[in-house]
């Protein structure tokens, strides 16, 4: 849940693209 690739695998844990 750090790089973009991790956010694609675990977006909830990364709180990344979908939350933006």
From Swiss-Prot:
Stored in epidermis and secreted into the hemolymph and cuticle. Not detected in the interior of the epidermis, fat body cells or columnar or goblet cells of the midgut epithelium (at protein level). Optimum temperature is 4-65 degrees Celsius. Activity decreases rapidly at higher temperatures, nearly 40% of activity is retained at 100 degrees Celsius. The keyword Glycoprotein applies. Optimum pH is 4.5-9.0. High activity is also seen over the range pH 2.0-4.5. Activity decreases with increasing pH above pH 9.0. One of its GO terms (molecular function) is serine-type endopeptidase inhibitor activity. The keyword DNA damage does not apply. Glycosylated. Coiled coil: none annotated. Keywords: Glycoprotein, Protease inhibitor, Serine protease inhibitor. Monomer. Inhibits trypsin and chymotrypsin. This is Protease inhibitor. It comes from Antheraea mylitta (Tasar silkworm). The lineage of its organism: Eukaryota, Metazoa, Ecdysozoa, Arthropoda, Hexapoda.
């Amino acid at each position: 849940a750090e790089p973009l690739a991790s956010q694609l695998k675990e977006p909830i844990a990364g709180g990344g693209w979908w939350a933006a």
